[in-house]
Amino acid sequence: MVLDESSWDNDHSPCYPGGLHYADDKIDAFLQGSTQYDALGHLWYGGKIWNGYDARTTVGGLDKASVAPIGERGVVGRGVLLDMARHRGKRMLDKGETFTHMDLEACAEAQGHTIEPHDILIIRTNFLQAFYEEGEAFYDGFCEPGLTYSEELVQWFHDKEIPNLVTDTIANEVTTDPVSGVALPLHCALMRNLGIAFTEICDLEKLAESCAKDRQYTFLYVAAPLKVHRATGSPVNPVVIK
Protein backbone atom coordinates (compact mmCIF):
# COMPACT_ATOMS: atom_id res chain seq x y z
CA MET A 1 0.00 0.00 0.00
CA VAL A 2 1.40 3.40 -0.97
CA LEU A 3 -1.32 5.59 0.57
CA ASP A 4 -3.60 5.13 3.58
CA GLU A 5 -4.91 7.26 6.45
CA SER A 6 -1.45 7.43 8.04
CA SER A 7 -0.21 9.25 4.92
CA TRP A 8 -1.99 12.34 6.21
CA ASP A 9 0.03 12.34 9.45
CA ASN A 10 2.72 14.49 7.82
CA ASP A 11 2.89 17.75 5.91
CA HIS A 12 3.68 16.11 2.54
CA SER A 13 0.33 14.37 2.05
CA PRO A 14 -1.99 15.18 -0.88
CA CYS A 15 -4.42 17.97 -0.19
CA TYR A 16 -7.83 18.12 -1.88
CA PRO A 17 -10.59 20.70 -1.42
CA GLY A 18 -13.22 19.29 0.93
CA GLY A 19 -10.79 17.11 2.88
CA LEU A 20 -10.80 13.99 0.67
CA HIS A 21 -8.50 11.17 1.82
CA TYR A 22 -7.96 7.88 -0.02
CA ALA A 23 -5.96 4.64 -0.12
CA ASP A 24 -3.91 3.35 -3.05
CA ASP A 25 -1.73 0.37 -3.92
CA LYS A 26 0.90 -0.78 -6.37
CA ILE A 27 1.96 -4.26 -7.45
CA ASP A 28 5.50 -5.57 -7.93
CA ALA A 29 5.09 -9.14 -9.15
CA PHE A 30 6.44 -11.80 -11.47
CA LEU A 31 4.10 -11.97 -14.46
CA GLN A 32 4.26 -15.78 -14.42
CA GLY A 33 4.20 -16.31 -10.67
CA SER A 34 0.47 -17.01 -10.41
CA THR A 35 -2.34 -18.25 -12.66
CA GLN A 36 -1.04 -17.00 -15.98
CA TYR A 37 -0.80 -17.19 -19.75
CA ASP A 38 2.53 -17.86 -21.42
CA ALA A 39 3.40 -15.74 -24.41
CA LEU A 40 4.12 -17.82 -27.51
CA GLY A 41 7.65 -16.42 -27.42
CA HIS A 42 8.19 -17.57 -23.85
CA LEU A 43 10.32 -20.59 -24.78
CA TRP A 44 12.28 -21.73 -27.81
CA TYR A 45 15.09 -23.90 -29.16
CA GLY A 46 17.49 -23.79 -32.09
CA GLY A 47 17.64 -20.00 -32.09
CA LYS A 48 14.04 -19.65 -33.31
CA ILE A 49 10.89 -18.80 -31.37
CA TRP A 50 7.28 -19.35 -32.47
CA ASN A 51 6.59 -18.70 -36.16
CA GLY A 52 10.28 -18.83 -37.04
CA TYR A 53 11.23 -15.48 -35.52
CA ASP A 54 14.85 -15.10 -34.45
CA ALA A 55 15.41 -15.69 -30.74
CA ARG A 56 17.33 -12.41 -30.62
CA THR A 57 13.95 -10.67 -30.85
CA THR A 58 13.52 -11.60 -27.18
CA VAL A 59 16.44 -9.47 -26.00
CA GLY A 60 15.20 -6.77 -23.62
CA GLY A 61 11.58 -7.82 -24.18
CA LEU A 62 9.63 -9.78 -26.78
CA ASP A 63 9.51 -7.82 -30.02
CA LYS A 64 7.62 -10.78 -31.50
CA ALA A 65 5.15 -13.27 -29.98
CA SER A 66 4.61 -11.40 -26.70
CA VAL A 67 1.53 -11.95 -24.56
CA ALA A 68 0.00 -8.65 -25.69
CA PRO A 69 -1.81 -10.06 -28.79
CA ILE A 70 -3.48 -12.72 -26.61
CA GLY A 71 -4.56 -9.97 -24.22
CA GLU A 72 -5.88 -7.81 -27.05
CA ARG A 73 -8.10 -10.57 -28.43
CA GLY A 74 -8.84 -12.54 -25.28
CA VAL A 75 -9.71 -16.23 -25.25
CA VAL A 76 -13.29 -17.48 -25.60
CA GLY A 77 -14.39 -21.00 -26.47
CA ARG A 78 -15.77 -24.33 -25.37
CA GLY A 79 -13.82 -25.50 -22.36
CA VAL A 80 -13.57 -29.18 -21.42
CA LEU A 81 -12.49 -30.30 -17.96
CA LEU A 82 -10.52 -33.54 -18.00
CA ASP A 83 -10.32 -34.58 -14.36
CA MET A 84 -7.41 -37.00 -14.56
CA ALA A 85 -7.03 -37.31 -10.80
CA ARG A 86 -10.67 -38.32 -10.29
CA HIS A 87 -10.58 -40.52 -13.41
CA ARG A 88 -7.70 -42.49 -11.92
CA GLY A 89 -9.35 -42.69 -8.53
CA LYS A 90 -6.76 -40.53 -6.81
CA ARG A 91 -6.88 -37.44 -4.62
CA MET A 92 -3.94 -36.12 -6.62
CA LEU A 93 -1.66 -37.54 -9.28
CA ASP A 94 1.76 -38.72 -8.16
CA LYS A 95 5.06 -36.96 -8.72
CA GLY A 96 6.22 -37.67 -12.27
CA GLU A 97 3.01 -39.53 -13.22
CA THR A 98 2.30 -39.30 -16.93
CA PHE A 99 -0.63 -39.56 -19.29
CA THR A 100 -1.15 -39.35 -23.05
CA HIS A 101 -3.75 -38.06 -25.49
CA MET A 102 -5.31 -41.52 -25.42
CA ASP A 103 -5.72 -41.16 -21.66
CA LEU A 104 -7.42 -37.81 -22.23
CA GLU A 105 -9.83 -39.45 -24.67
CA ALA A 106 -10.55 -42.23 -22.16
CA CYS A 107 -11.15 -39.68 -19.41
CA ALA A 108 -13.59 -37.76 -21.61
CA GLU A 109 -15.45 -40.96 -22.50
CA ALA A 110 -15.74 -41.90 -18.82
CA GLN A 111 -17.11 -38.44 -18.09
CA GLY A 112 -19.73 -38.80 -20.82
CA HIS A 113 -18.50 -36.45 -23.52
CA THR A 114 -16.04 -36.18 -26.38
CA ILE A 115 -13.13 -33.88 -27.16
CA GLU A 116 -14.04 -31.82 -30.22
CA PRO A 117 -11.86 -29.75 -32.57
CA HIS A 118 -11.01 -26.31 -31.14
CA ASP A 119 -11.85 -27.31 -27.56
CA ILE A 120 -9.91 -25.60 -24.77
CA LEU A 121 -8.49 -28.47 -22.73
CA ILE A 122 -8.47 -28.03 -18.95
CA ILE A 123 -6.63 -30.82 -17.14
CA ARG A 124 -6.88 -31.38 -13.39
CA THR A 125 -4.14 -33.25 -11.51
CA ASN A 126 -4.61 -31.61 -8.08
CA PHE A 127 -0.82 -31.89 -7.70
CA LEU A 128 -0.43 -28.38 -6.30
CA GLN A 129 -2.25 -29.60 -3.22
CA ALA A 130 1.07 -31.21 -2.32
CA PHE A 131 2.65 -27.74 -2.17
CA TYR A 132 0.16 -26.59 0.44
CA GLU A 133 0.71 -29.75 2.44
CA GLU A 134 4.49 -30.12 2.12
CA GLY A 135 5.77 -26.55 1.83
CA GLU A 136 9.40 -26.34 0.66
CA ALA A 137 9.66 -30.14 0.58
CA PHE A 138 7.36 -29.97 -2.46
CA TYR A 139 10.42 -29.04 -4.55
CA ASP A 140 12.58 -31.99 -3.44
CA GLY A 141 13.14 -34.16 -6.52
CA PHE A 142 10.68 -31.89 -8.29
CA CYS A 143 8.85 -33.52 -11.20
CA GLU A 144 5.23 -32.62 -11.82
CA PRO A 145 2.76 -35.08 -13.30
CA GLY A 146 1.41 -34.32 -16.74
CA LEU A 147 1.24 -35.04 -20.43
CA THR A 148 4.28 -36.76 -21.88
CA TYR A 149 5.74 -36.21 -25.34
CA SER A 150 5.16 -38.44 -28.34
CA GLU A 151 4.84 -37.70 -32.04
CA GLU A 152 1.33 -39.15 -31.91
CA LEU A 153 0.31 -36.77 -29.12
CA VAL A 154 1.61 -33.74 -31.00
CA GLN A 155 -0.20 -34.87 -34.16
CA TRP A 156 -3.40 -35.34 -32.12
CA PHE A 157 -3.20 -31.76 -30.83
CA HIS A 158 -2.58 -30.59 -34.40
CA ASP A 159 -5.49 -32.56 -35.84
CA LYS A 160 -7.83 -31.36 -33.08
CA GLU A 161 -6.61 -27.77 -33.59
CA ILE A 162 -6.51 -27.27 -29.82
CA PRO A 163 -5.95 -23.52 -29.22
CA ASN A 164 -5.30 -23.50 -25.47
CA LEU A 165 -3.98 -26.01 -22.91
CA VAL A 166 -4.91 -25.22 -19.30
CA THR A 167 -3.77 -27.10 -16.18
CA ASP A 168 -3.35 -26.75 -12.43
CA THR A 169 0.40 -27.42 -12.61
CA ILE A 170 3.33 -25.05 -13.02
CA ALA A 171 4.40 -26.34 -16.45
CA ASN A 172 1.38 -28.07 -18.09
CA GLU A 173 3.43 -31.23 -18.70
CA VAL A 174 5.59 -33.75 -16.88
CA THR A 175 8.68 -31.77 -15.87
CA THR A 176 11.22 -34.19 -17.34
CA ASP A 177 10.28 -36.62 -20.09
CA PRO A 178 10.78 -40.14 -18.68
CA VAL A 179 11.98 -41.57 -22.01
CA SER A 180 14.28 -38.90 -23.45
CA GLY A 181 15.21 -37.08 -20.24
CA VAL A 182 14.42 -33.78 -21.97
CA ALA A 183 12.95 -30.98 -19.89
CA LEU A 184 9.58 -29.56 -21.00
CA PRO A 185 9.50 -30.94 -24.57
CA LEU A 186 5.80 -30.07 -25.02
CA HIS A 187 6.52 -26.40 -24.45
CA CYS A 188 8.62 -26.69 -27.60
CA ALA A 189 6.37 -29.04 -29.58
CA LEU A 190 2.99 -27.51 -28.72
CA MET A 191 3.69 -23.87 -27.90
CA ARG A 192 6.75 -23.06 -30.00
CA ASN A 193 5.85 -25.26 -33.00
CA LEU A 194 2.03 -25.34 -33.06
CA GLY A 195 1.24 -21.99 -31.41
CA ILE A 196 -0.91 -23.46 -28.63
CA ALA A 197 -1.38 -21.04 -25.74
CA PHE A 198 -0.44 -22.40 -22.31
CA THR A 199 -2.33 -21.43 -19.16
CA GLU A 200 -0.78 -22.66 -15.93
CA ILE A 201 -1.28 -22.82 -12.15
CA CYS A 202 -5.08 -22.72 -12.28
CA ASP A 203 -7.19 -23.51 -9.22
CA LEU A 204 -9.59 -26.12 -10.61
CA GLU A 205 -10.97 -27.54 -7.37
CA LYS A 206 -14.36 -25.80 -7.23
CA LEU A 207 -14.86 -26.42 -10.94
CA ALA A 208 -14.01 -30.10 -10.52
CA GLU A 209 -16.46 -30.43 -7.62
CA SER A 210 -19.20 -28.79 -9.68
CA CYS A 211 -18.57 -30.99 -12.72
CA ALA A 212 -18.52 -34.17 -10.64
CA LYS A 213 -21.82 -33.17 -9.06
CA ASP A 214 -23.81 -32.27 -12.18
CA ARG A 215 -21.80 -34.37 -14.70
CA GLN A 216 -21.45 -31.32 -16.95
CA TYR A 217 -17.81 -31.22 -18.00
CA THR A 218 -18.16 -28.78 -20.90
CA PHE A 219 -18.80 -25.06 -20.59
CA LEU A 220 -17.97 -21.57 -21.84
CA TYR A 221 -14.39 -20.61 -21.01
CA VAL A 222 -13.37 -16.94 -21.03
CA ALA A 223 -9.99 -15.39 -20.23
CA ALA A 224 -8.45 -11.95 -20.78
CA PRO A 225 -4.72 -11.73 -19.99
CA LEU A 226 -3.28 -8.29 -19.37
CA LYS A 227 -1.96 -6.48 -22.44
CA VAL A 228 1.58 -6.12 -21.12
CA HIS A 229 3.88 -4.69 -23.80
CA ARG A 230 6.64 -7.11 -24.90
CA ALA A 231 5.92 -9.41 -21.94
CA THR A 232 6.65 -13.13 -21.69
CA GLY A 233 3.39 -13.80 -19.85
CA SER A 234 0.52 -12.29 -17.92
CA PRO A 235 -1.56 -12.96 -14.82
CA VAL A 236 -5.12 -13.96 -15.64
CA ASN A 237 -8.37 -14.85 -13.91
CA PRO A 238 -10.19 -17.32 -16.18
CA VAL A 239 -13.97 -17.55 -15.88
CA VAL A 240 -16.12 -20.60 -16.60
CA ILE A 241 -19.86 -20.29 -17.32
CA LYS A 242 -21.88 -23.51 -17.15
Regions found by a protein language model. Give the residues of each.
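Active-/binding-site microenvironments in catalytic and ligand-binding cores
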Residues: M1-K242
